[in-house]
């Protein structure tokens, strides 16, 4: 390990008129792309639905793929596509925070077009009206959460306690 800290540079640019950050670092030919959507305007009582959206995007049918075929295509064309909700506190004012919905993917250079088409397919044409499939996903999420609580109850209790004092912890608890 080197003792020096590697300095990262953020290069601000525009891609198709959209603000972007570029990091010129060696990645062995793997491209990492994060799409960030500002969701701070969403009311607090609606945040659990954003958490649900995070859970279902990529796991429901889209315009061109059934969910099983979509999963196979994601595996073939990318190193995965994931969704996250990021709440980060302002370092200068703890009462202020930013809230983003993140869609993250990684892929090899020759798969760029296919990977970005899949992200667009998921974001723009996911079928959120299939109640049976949504129920399956919610039931799976509930089961995973119940199993996690069994092994990490102390962590969950700590996160809930923090949610009473921290806006970002509250967002994490709600989503």
Question: Where is each model-derived feature located?
Answer:
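Proteolytic maturation boundary segments
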Residues: 1-48
């Amino acid at each position: 390990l080197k003792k020096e800290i590697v300095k990262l540079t953020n290069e601000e640019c525009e891609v198709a008129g959209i603000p972007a950050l570029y990091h010129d670092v060696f990645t062995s030919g793997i491209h990492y792309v994060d799409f960030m959507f500002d969701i701070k305007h969403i009311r607090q009582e609606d945040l659990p639905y954003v958490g649900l959206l995070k859970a279902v995007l990529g796991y429901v049918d889209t315009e061109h793929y059934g969910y099983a075929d979509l999963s196979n295509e994601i595996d073939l064309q990318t190193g995965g596509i994931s969704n996250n909700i990021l709440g980060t506190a302002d370092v200068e004012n703890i009462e202020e925070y930013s809230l983003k919905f993140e869609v993250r993917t990684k892929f090899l250079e020759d798969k760029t077009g296919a990977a970005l088409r899949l992200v667009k397919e998921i974001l723009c044409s996911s079928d959120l009206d299939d109640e049976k499939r949504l129920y399956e996903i919610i039931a799976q999420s509930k089961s995973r959460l119940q199993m996690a609580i069994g092994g990490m109850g102390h962590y969950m209790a700590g996160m809930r306690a923090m949610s009473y004092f921290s806006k970002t912890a509250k967002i994490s608890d709600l989503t």
